[in-house]
Amino acid sequence: MLNSHNTNHNNNSASNSNYNKGHKMHLKSATAKATIMKHKLSKFYGYGWMQVFLLLTVLVIGNQSAWQENIRPKLYVELGPEDVLKFVGNESVVDHFKLVTKDGNSLLIGARNTVFNLSIHDLVEQQRLVWTSPEDDTKMCLVKGKDEEACQNYIRIMVVPSPGRLFVCGTNSFRPMCNTYIISDSNYTLEATKNGQAVCPYDPRHNSTSVLADNELYSGTVADFSGSDPIIYREPLQTEQYDSLSLNAPNFVSSFTQGDFVYFFFRETAVEFINCGKAIYSRVARVCKWDKGGPHRFRNRWTSFLKSRLNCSIPGDYPFYFNEIQSASNLVEGQYGSMSSKLIYGVFNTPSNSIPGSAVCAFALQDIADTFEGQFKEQTGINSNWLPVNNAKVPDPRPGSCHNDSRALPDPTLNFIKTHSLMDENVPAFFSQPILVRTSTIYRFTQIAVDAQIKTPGGKTYDVIFVGTDHGKIIKSVNAESADSADKVTSVVIEEIDVLTKSEPIRNLEIVRTMQYDQPKDGSYDDGKLIIVTDSQVVAIQLHRCHNDKITSCSECVALQDPYCAWDKIAGKCRSHGAPRWLEENYFYQNVATGQHAACPSGKINSKDANAGEQKGFRNDMDLLDSRRQSKDQEIIDNIDKNFEDIINAQYTVETLVMAVLAGSIFSLLVGFFTGYFCGRRCHKDEDDNLPYPDTEYEYFEQRQNVNSFPSSCRIQQEPKLLPQVEEVTYAEPVLLPQPPPPNKMHSPKNTLRKPPMHQMHQGPNSETLFQFQPDGYNTQQSYRGRDNFGTLRSHQVMGDNYRRGDGFSTTRSVKKAVNNTNTRNRSLGRARRQPPRHGIVTQHRSNSPQQQQQQSQQPHSSSGSSPVMSNSSSSPAPPSSSPSPQESPKNCSYIYRD
């Protein structure tokens, strides 16, 4: 392929060289131009389309081998009002709900000027804490140019440091403040107030995060009004201010604490990519809990801050990256195959100007720790690449580690950590690839919540993933291979749930469970709820829909591959997680890995409302179920049958799309070619296309191909086959004005008049040739307007005599030549010049007014203003000039001048 590419490159160079030569010939010949255009078109049609075809073929092959197709959900669920618990809050204004904190059997929801205390059971409001901005702060916010909506107090930090106490921070009209309240049965009592700078953001649109560890609050936010000073803060320590090596325009996502470290997840502009452009990378950073700062100038700076890139990509020779992290789950600890690991799940998106795509990736805490123990990355010069640092250059003790007293660290370690906070290696995805990939122009992933290690009959455990989108949908999925392998992924999308009555982005997802379970009437247990938070409402739904009475068979229940659901062979119905004897495999049938069970008969269920049964292969012969939205309050399940195949047929594969593009391109090419060909055959060219200067405003009245090629005996070539006895040719003869041009028109582009040749300056006053131009006698105002020697204005031809005739202005006169075809051509040219013309009559016709004619008759003839060969009042031929002119009319040739 390399040799072939070089060959094509050389051929292209030779073609370009030929084209350059032809381009020079284009100035001389129109035929050369046509040849070049044919050469270029033949080159394009010859192998240009072949290159396009090969490119599309490679894209198709690459798509088949690398890209993961969108996985269809088993169920499309549309919930009714009785299936959803909803809290709206203030209906007059948008509350901008965002934070959710669990406090026993209560939910604390942070919103606009308010903290709502809701019951987990039914989302009924129990208490309300109202905290508005002081009037002075609101006025100052408005003076600084913010609108009234932004000059409110949006709750952005909310933690429970101890039972009965609540720590809350709000934007407070772009002047952050933090309050500590004591919670009682009836109200909230203010205990303390402090400045919220570097803890809470100024702008409610800024993303921030916080976590409480060992009664110390760690926050990631911005520390100034403009939002240009990002910071990771724990009083009194902070990251370097205005240092792009530490934080470069970050958007914080989440944070958690584990062991001796606190971890932050965010996305930022990649400083290591700055020499190649701008890109956003996902990061994980950590600081040590025991960090006390350094000595002297490092006393208020972190001495343990490190960060690394999170690699969520589709593997291959050229990985496809999902670079922008949007949300992260809590730390999940579980069994994955033979490994016991602690995982963090995150949702990642492509950039907004890229292919719309989202993915879910998991990262092991051990892999993150190993990355922070690896090599550092550095840039030695401003134009240098970012390269790993040799381990021999790393000082001892190692920067970024936890020390008993960081204030005793030596200067080499402190200086190194200040300029080398970025690690060289990326944190790999735990399963070596994304768990779920979705490409859609309709929605992207925004939030994630994970219900960890759900046990199934037989003892296997699975993490159930709930993903929120910016279109108000919930996607429930599971990795069917996670219980048996730590490096394989079999994605199963169990449900796509349409929860909201109107589409709006999901801001937060939380899985909550009550302290005690209440046993419902059907014998199953209420094992939790999914809390969905948007700007205008808080919604709670069940984690599963196993008890739906539309699931009537064992094969339907098992085919869901839902870890929450299993078929109760004694009761003969689908039961949910938490039912009695749930872990006993002898009482329940379930197979999350394949969706099939040997004890469940397969077959098509011909139910009118819900069809389920006949299984079709999809990823290890898994059963796919579809749904049909039948009502507002029920979920309908459809098996893959004729309806599903109709949906499949309505979608197009990549191969079909490529073939359609190729067929359409070829068809368009053929239609364009034949249309141009037939139009060229039927349509005649305009006369202006044959002019020597078609892009100017000059043109010939009439021109013959042989007007400049004439024999020695006559000016005009006779063509007996085409002409009658007398041949007449009419052409435009410009008029020369003798006076100098005005100063303001000396450099005019239309000032193209030229002086007559020097050898004609001594001719007689009545002589005139084709190259000697004389002014019109009736032009009394002596108006000046430069004209080209070769034609007249198109506007003059179109408008006729009305073109600037109000001031007696005229530019040209028409000359008509008549040739008698009966005379012999054998007479010598010298004799023809000595004798006056016998058969030709030279006349001059002018359309002057009577006053102008009288003035002209009284003026004496001069060399500069003499009339042509004959005057207006005389019809006799003029005497010949003393010296014959090369352009003088020969024998048998005559001129007829016309205006």
UniProtKB/Swiss-Prot annotation:
This protein's GO CC annotations: membrane; plasma membrane
Compositionally skewed regions (Basic residues) per UniProt: 828-837
Major localisation: membrane
Bias-annotated ranges (Low complexity): 1-20, 847-876
GO MF annotation list: chemorepellent activity; heparin binding; semaphorin receptor binding
Record carries keyword Membrane: yes
Tissues expressing the protein: Expressed by subsets of neurons and muscles.
Extracellular membrane side: 62-657
Region (Disordered): 1-24, 735-766, 798-899
Positions with biased composition (Polar residues): 809-827
Bilayer topology term: Multi-pass membrane protein
GO BP terms, alphabetized: axon guidance; axon midline choice point recognition; dendrite morphogenesis; motor neuron axon guidance; negative chemotaxis; negative regulation of cell size; photoreceptor cell axon guidance; positive regulation of cell migration
Known function: Involved in growth cone guidance through its role in axonal repulsion. Function in neurons is essential for adult survival, motor neuron survival, and is important for climbing behavior and activity.
Stated name of the protein: Semaphorin-1A
Organism: Drosophila melanogaster (Fruit fly)
